Structures are given as structure tokens and as C-alpha cells.
């Protein structure tokens, strides 16, 4: 366990300090100093006892040593070794009992000191072993701390490298996304270019096909001829003329002339139909522009005046470009594409505008909606059934047109033409035609889907327009009641209707109705102007006449309800009905209010049924 260490007891140290203090006060011999050192030392006393006493006390200094011991013991608190003498002059005698007691006490103290020393030494050994253990633990912990620091530094470096790698990967991902976007744009542009090239090639192919057909039909091949089997004779029983070159040439010429006449007749019909369709489409486009321009100014003036003017100017520019271009000189495909694109664009604008109006109407109706404003379910179901019937009719018409076109395309050709065409057609062209046919089917499906969505939007538009017309009629009624004298107007209108019932001449009806029309226009300046604009802007088709009937019916119903005139007074003459050719106007009134409502609803449904066929 190493060398023994000298550890001093604190009690002994304090006693030694006291001894040194007392000895410093008295004069001490060298032998006494040596004895003090022996007491303070840590060497065991049993080894040096004889030597110490041999040196300390001799036969010559017994008295001195006894006096010294007495003095020292008295300083430590022990009783004196001498007996107390009554007289100062008498000699003091040594007290053996006191000496023995002092020796016993000194021995007890020595034993206690030895036990304390042993306990201190064992404690010191324990503390030394604990210190060694703690030092070893400290060294181990220090090594662990160093290793953990190294690991932490390595992890920090790895984290830094991973962060740098992550940044580089993010940058690469961003670059890849940009590259993908560029490639997608390039692919889209190339796809559009490819579609244009395909259309151009199709046109060229059709032209070449027509040219080939003309060349084949005009060219005569003598080697190949067509024989007639199961020849049927004439009805009169006469024999036919002999076959000669002249008769065959004349018959072939007549056949070709008949075929050419048929082709020209069909071509004229198709051109006339195309011209009518072009007129209808252009008129529809103009009227849609006229419908959209006043309606879009109001909501867009509130939000952004600039955007509304730009959109309307774009529509007007498109219409101006179509009108400026020589539409009749262009081919059918280009005109059709231009018209369909422009109409689709205007239809989207109209759809967005209607959706905005729908949102505004839903907000207004959510605040205060009455049960009278809601359309009944039966009316809605009836309208849907009528629209479905009209859709089926349109489908049947489309199928009939397709059959006619197929019949026109599938004209009977000669054996010469069939053989040449079979030789000319290649496998690649057949595959390309199959691919185009699949694309056509997909486009047809998409067109049907869009058509359904457009029909639904048209139904919603019709319902909203009906609600709007009812609100407008109520508003006109209120304005009329607020701005005119009710009693005076009743008297004038009663006179007017009595004049209507008395006269059978339509001119008389028109003359009597003119001042009333002027009064109506002077009373409500805003709403009739809007209705006139709407009626003017609609296309000149059966739907426009029906729509005009609805407007006139609504205005008539509002005027009848304002003036409180009975249905008998409002009946016009039969001559006036015949002269107007079933066109309602301000002069001719329905037989009753219920008839007016039924006429409005039927005309409104027929108008929207025609609107559903839009692309």
C-alpha cells in the first residue's frame, strides 16, 4: 500500500501547542526538550522507553527530575506529586499514591492516543484507496469525454456534408423542373405544329384524291370493261340497238353527264347550307357580342374598368377581323375553325358572366328568399323532359346527316377506279387512317361531354333568365305605379280597350295602341330600352321570335296587372291575330293571364332548346 504516512491527531496537536507555550515560559533543560519531541513523535513509545528514561533520569538528578515531572504534571492538570507541608521551611515529601495515579492516567491517555492513531491510519488508508479509485474513474471519464467530443465533431462534420449535399440536390431538382417545363412547352408547340401539318397534309391528300378521281373518270381504258349480268329487256318488248363504238361512247357520255349533274346539284346544296350556317354563326356571334357588351360593363366598371374594356375590345376586334376577311373566299375548314374558336371564347365569357350573376343571385336569395320565387319541381321536370326530347331529335338529325354524307362519299365507282385505288392505298395510310379514326372518336366523346355541360349551363341560364324577367316585370309594375296617376290611367285604358273591342280593322288597333306605347316608354325609360336591345340582339331564327314573344308577353302581363283590366276587355279581334301571323306585340294581347304565362313558358323553353345546340 505504499509508505506509511505520519498523520497527527488534532487533539494532540493542540496539546503540543499548549505544551510549547508553557515550556517557552519556563526555563527547560535539553533533556526536557528531547522528551517533548519524543512525546510528539509518531514512533511507538515501547521501543524507546528504556532509552528515554536512561537518559532522562540519573542517580544524580533524581530530585530535579521529580521536580520537573511535578511541574509538568501540574501544568497538564494533574495533582502535585509532593505532599503539602504545613510549614514552608519543612522539606516536601514525595506522595507515592499521587505518583501512581498520575502514571495510570498517563498510561490510559497513551492507550487512547494509540487507538486514535490506529483509527486515523486505517481511515487514511481508506481515503488513499478511495482517492486512487476516484483518480482512475476520473481518467476513464476524461477518456470517454475525449471520445464523445471526437464523435460529436465527426457527426457535426457529417451533418454539414449532408446539408451541403441536400442543397445541391435541391438545386438539381429545381434545374430539372425548369428543364421539364421547357421540354413540355417545346412538346406542346411541336404538337400544335404537328396538328397543323397533319391538317395541311389531309387537305393535300383530299385534293390529290379528287384529282386522281377526275383523271380516272375522264380517262378511258379499252381493255377493261364492265359487263351487265341478267339484262332486263325493255318494257315495250323492242330489241335494243346494236352495240357500237358510237352508242357506247354516247351512253357513257350521258352517264357521266348525269353523274356530274348530280354531283353539281349536291355541291350547290351543300354550299347553300354552308352559306346559311355561316350567316347564322356570324349573326349569333354578333348578337352574343351585343348581349355581352352592355352586361359586362356594369360589374366590371365597379371592379376594373380597364379589364372589361379590353375584353370587349378583343371580342369586337375578333368580329371585325372575321368581317374584314373574305369569309366566302376561305375554305370551309378555316372558316369553321375561326367561327368555332370565336364562339367558344364568347361562350366561355358568357358562362363566366352567368356564373358571377348566379353567385350574386344566390347571395341576394340567401338574404331574403320567398317561396314564390322558387320554381316548382314539376315545371323543372317538364322542362328537362322537353329538353331531352329536343336533344334526341337533334341526335336523329345528326345521324341522318351522317348517313347522307356517307352515302355521298360511298358513291359507286368503276372497276378501273377501284383497282387503281386499291393499288394506290398503302398500309401506312391505312394505319394512319385508323389512328385518325380513334382520335376522331375521342374528340367526339369530348364533344359530347362538353355538349352536356353546355346544355346544363343553358338550363341554368334559362332558369335564371326567367327569374330575372319576373323580377323585372315586378319592378316595372312598381315604377309604373309610383310615377303615374293610377285613376286617370285606368279611365284612359278602359276607353282604349273599348275602342279595341269595337273596331275590327288592324290599322285602327295600331292607331289606338300608339299613344299607349308612347306613354309606357315615357314612364319607364330604362327597362323597355333594355328589352328592345335584347330582342334586337337575338339571332333571326325561330328561337328569336319565341324570345320576342316572351318579352312582349311579360310586358303585356305587367301592364294588364297594373291597369286592372278584365280578360274580356283585353281580347283582340280575330282580324288582328291573322294580320300579325302569330307574332305577339304590344297591340295584340293574350286571352287571359294564364294564357300569357303558358305562352311565355313555351316560348322560353323553345328558345333555350335551340340554344342548347351551341358548341
From Swiss-Prot:
<comment type="similarity">
    <text>Belongs to the ADIP family.</text>
</comment>
<feature type="coiled-coil region">
    <location>
        <begin position="126"/>
        <end position="227"/>
    </location>
</feature>
<keyword id="KW-0966">Cell projection</keyword>
<dbReference type="GO" id="GO:0036064">
    <property type="term" value="C:ciliary basal body"/>
</dbReference>
<dbReference type="GO" id="GO:0060271">
    <property type="term" value="P:cilium assembly"/>
</dbReference>
<dbReference type="GO" id="GO:0007155">
    <property type="term" value="P:cell adhesion"/>
</dbReference>
<feature type="coiled-coil region">
    <location>
        <begin position="375"/>
        <end position="461"/>
    </location>
</feature>
<dbReference type="GO" id="GO:0007098">
    <property type="term" value="P:centrosome cycle"/>
</dbReference>
<dbReference type="GO" id="GO:0035735">
    <property type="term" value="P:intraciliary transport involved in cilium assembly"/>
</dbReference>
<feature type="modified residue" description="Phosphoserine">
    <location>
        <position position="290"/>
    </location>
</feature>
<dbReference type="InterPro" id="IPR052300">
    <property type="entry name" value="Adhesion_Centrosome_assoc"/>
</dbReference>
<keyword id="KW-0206">Cytoskeleton</keyword>
<dbReference type="GO" id="GO:0005912">
    <property type="term" value="C:adherens junction"/>
</dbReference>
<feature type="region of interest" description="Disordered">
    <location>
        <begin position="293"/>
        <end position="316"/>
    </location>
</feature>
<dbReference type="GO" id="GO:0031252">
    <property type="term" value="C:cell leading edge"/>
</dbReference>
<keyword id="KW-0965">Cell junction</keyword>
<feature type="modified residue" description="Phosphoserine">
    <location>
        <position position="543"/>
    </location>
</feature>
<feature type="modified residue" description="Phosphoserine">
    <location>
        <position position="313"/>
    </location>
</feature>
<comment type="subunit">
    <text>Interacts with SSX2 and SSX3. Does not interact with SSX1 and SSX4. Interacts with afadin and alpha-actinin. Interacts with VAV2. Interacts with PCM1. Interacts with WRAP73.</text>
</comment>
<dbReference type="GO" id="GO:0019904">
    <property type="term" value="F:protein domain specific binding"/>
</dbReference>
<dbReference type="GO" id="GO:0032991">
    <property type="term" value="C:protein-containing complex"/>
</dbReference>
<keyword id="KW-0175">Coiled coil</keyword>
<keyword id="KW-0963">Cytoplasm</keyword>
<dbReference type="GO" id="GO:0034451">
    <property type="term" value="C:centriolar satellite"/>
</dbReference>
<keyword id="KW-0970">Cilium biogenesis/degradation</keyword>
<feature type="modified residue" description="Phosphoserine">
    <location>
        <position position="541"/>
    </location>
</feature>
<dbReference type="GO" id="GO:0035020">
    <property type="term" value="P:regulation of Rac protein signal transduction"/>
</dbReference>
<dbReference type="InterPro" id="IPR021622">
    <property type="entry name" value="Afadin/alpha-actinin-bd"/>
</dbReference>
<dbReference type="Pfam" id="PF11559">
    <property type="entry name" value="ADIP"/>
</dbReference>
<feature type="coiled-coil region">
    <location>
        <begin position="266"/>
        <end position="293"/>
    </location>
</feature>
<keyword id="KW-0130">Cell adhesion</keyword>
<feature type="modified residue" description="Phosphoserine">
    <location>
        <position position="293"/>
    </location>
</feature>
<feature type="modified residue" description="Phosphoserine">
    <location>
        <position position="319"/>
    </location>
</feature>
<comment type="function">
    <text>Belongs to an adhesion system, which plays a role in the organization of homotypic, interneuronal and heterotypic cell-cell adherens junctions (AJs). May connect the nectin-afadin and E-cadherin-catenin system through alpha-actinin and may be involved in organization of the actin cytoskeleton at AJs through afadin and alpha-actinin. Acts as a centrosome maturation factor, probably by maintaining the integrity of the pericentriolar material and proper microtubule nucleation at mitotic spindle poles.</text>
</comment>
<keyword id="KW-0597">Phosphoprotein</keyword>
<dbReference type="GO" id="GO:0005737">
    <property type="term" value="C:cytoplasm"/>
</dbReference>
<protein>
    <recommendedName>
        <fullName>Afadin- and alpha-actinin-binding protein</fullName>
    </recommendedName>
</protein>
<feature type="region of interest" description="Disordered">
    <location>
        <begin position="567"/>
        <end position="615"/>
    </location>
</feature>
<keyword id="KW-0539">Nucleus</keyword>
<feature type="modified residue" description="Phosphoserine">
    <location>
        <position position="537"/>
    </location>
</feature>
<feature type="compositionally biased region" description="Basic and acidic residues">
    <location>
        <begin position="568"/>
        <end position="581"/>
    </location>
</feature>
<dbReference type="GO" id="GO:2000145">
    <property type="term" value="P:regulation of cell motility"/>
</dbReference>
Amino acid at each position: 500500500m505504499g509508505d506509511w504516512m505520519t498523520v497527527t491527531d488534532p487533539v494532540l496537536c493542540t496539546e503540543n501547542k499548549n505544551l510549547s507555550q508553557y515550556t517557552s515560559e519556563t526555563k527547560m533543560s535539553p533533556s526536557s526538550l528531547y522528551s517533548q519531541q519524543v512525546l510528539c513523535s509518531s514512533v511507538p513509545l515501547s521501543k524507546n522507553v528504556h532509552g528515554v528514561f536512561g537518559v532522562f533520569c540519573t542517580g544524580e538528578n533524581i530530585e530535579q527530575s521529580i521536580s520537573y515531572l511535578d511541574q509538568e504534571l501540574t501544568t497538564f492538570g494533574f495533582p502535585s506529586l509532593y505532599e503539602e507541608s504545613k510549614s514552608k521551611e519543612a522539606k516536601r515529601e514525595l506522595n507515592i499514591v499521587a505518583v501512581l495515579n498520575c502514571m495510570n492516567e498517563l498510561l490510559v491517555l497513551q492507550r487512547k492516543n494509540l487507538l486514535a492513531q490506529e483509527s486515523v491510519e486505517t481511515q487514511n488508508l481508506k481515503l488513499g484507496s478511495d482517492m486512487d479509485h476516484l483518480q482512475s474513474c476520473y481518467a476513464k471519464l476524461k477518456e470517454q469525454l475525449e471520445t464523445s467530443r471526437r464523435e460529436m465533431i465527426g457527426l457535426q462534420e457529417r451533418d454539414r456534408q449532408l446539408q451541403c449535399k441536400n442543397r445541391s440536390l435541391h438545386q438539381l431538382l429545381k434545374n430539372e423542373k425548369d428543364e421539364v417545363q421547357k421540354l413540355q412547352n417545346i412538346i406542346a408547340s411541336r404538337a400544335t405544329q404537328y396538328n397543323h401539318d397533319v391538317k395541311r397534309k389531309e387537305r393535300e391528300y383530299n385534293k390529290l384524291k379528287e384529282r386522281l378521281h377526275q383523271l380516272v373518270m375522264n380517262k378511258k381504258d379499252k381493255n377493261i370493261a364492265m359487263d351487265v349480268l341478267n339484262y332486263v329487256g325493255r318494257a315495250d318488248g323492242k330489241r335494243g340497238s346494236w352495240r357500237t363504238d358510237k352508242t357506247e361512247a354516247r351512253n357513257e357520255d350521258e352517264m357521266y353527264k348525269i353523274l356530274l349533274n348530280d354531283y353539281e346539284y349536291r355541291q350547290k346544296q351543300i354550299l347553300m347550307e354552308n352559306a346559311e350556317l355561316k350567316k347564322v354563326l356570324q349573326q349569333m356571334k354578333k348578337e352574343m357580342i351585343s348581349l355581352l357588351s352592355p352586361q359586362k360593363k356594369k360589374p366590371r366598371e365597379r371592379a376594373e374598368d380597364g379589364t372589361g374594356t379590353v375584353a370587349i375590345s378583343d371580342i369586337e376586334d375578333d368580329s371585325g377581323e372575321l368581317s374584314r376577311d373574305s369569309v366566302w373566299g376561305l375554305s370551309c375548314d378555316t372558316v369553321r375553325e375561326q367561327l368555332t374558336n370565336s364562339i367558344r371564347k364568347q361562350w366561355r365569357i358568357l358562362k363566366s358572366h352567368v356564373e358571377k350573376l348566379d353567385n350574386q343571385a344566390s347571395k341576394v336569395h340567401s338574404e331574403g328568399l320567398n317561396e314564390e320565387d322558387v320554381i316548382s319541381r314539376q315545371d323543372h321536370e317538364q322542362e328537362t323532359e322537353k329538353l331531352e326530347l329536343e336533344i334526341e331529335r337533334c341526335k336523329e338529325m345528326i345521324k341522318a346527316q351522317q348517313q347522307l354524307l356517307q352515302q355521298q362519299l360511298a358513291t359507286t365507282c368503276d372497276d378501273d377506279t377501284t383497282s387503281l385505288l386499291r393499288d394506290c392505298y398503302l398500309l401506312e395510310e391505312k394505319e394512319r387512317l385508323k389512328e385518325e379514326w380513334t382520335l376522331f372518336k375521342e374528340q367526339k366523346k369530348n364533344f359530347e361531354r362538353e355538349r352536356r355541360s353546355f346544355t346544363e349551363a343553358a338550363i341554368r341560364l334559362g332558369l335564371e333568365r326567367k327569374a330575372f324577367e319576373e323580377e323585372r316585370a315586378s319592378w316595372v309594375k312598381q315604377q309604373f305605379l309610383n310615377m303615374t296617376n293610377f285613376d286617370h290611367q285606368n279611365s284612359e285604358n278602359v276607353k282604349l280597350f273599348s275602342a279595341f273591342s269595337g273596331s275590327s280593322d288592324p290599322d285602327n288597333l295600331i292607331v289606338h295602341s300608339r299613344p299607349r306605347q308612347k306613354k309606357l316608354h315615357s314612364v319607364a325609360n330604362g327597362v323597355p330600352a333594355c328589352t328592345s336591345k335584347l330582342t334586337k340582339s337575338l339571332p333571326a331564327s325561330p328561337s328569336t321570335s319565341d324570345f320576342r314573344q316572351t318579352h312582349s308577353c311579360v310586358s303585356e302581363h305587367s301592364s294588364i296587372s297594373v291597369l286592372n283590366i278584365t280578360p274580356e276587355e283585353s281580347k283582340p279581334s280575330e282580324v288582328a291575330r291573322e294580320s300579325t301571323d302569330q307574332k305577339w306585340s304590344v297591340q295584340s294581347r293574350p286571352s287571359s293571364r294564364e294564357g300569357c304565362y303558358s305562352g311565355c313558358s313555351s316560348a322560353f323553353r323553345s328558345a333555350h332548346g335551340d340554344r342548347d345546340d351551341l358548341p
